[in-house]
Curated annotation (Swiss-Prot):
The lineage of its organism: Eukaryota, Metazoa, Ecdysozoa, Arthropoda, Hexapoda. It is found in: Secreted. Hormone that controls sex pheromone production in larvae. Belongs to the pyrokinin family. It comes from the Eukaryota. GO terms for molecular function: neuropeptide hormone activity. This is Pheromonotropin.
């Protein structure tokens, strides 16, 4: 499974970085 950071990195354009 992908970790939270991996998902955020993969969807960096969609998910804003906190």
């Amino acid at each position: 499974k992908l970790s939270y950071d991996d998902k955020v990195f993969e969807n960096v354009e969609f998910t804003p970085r906190l």
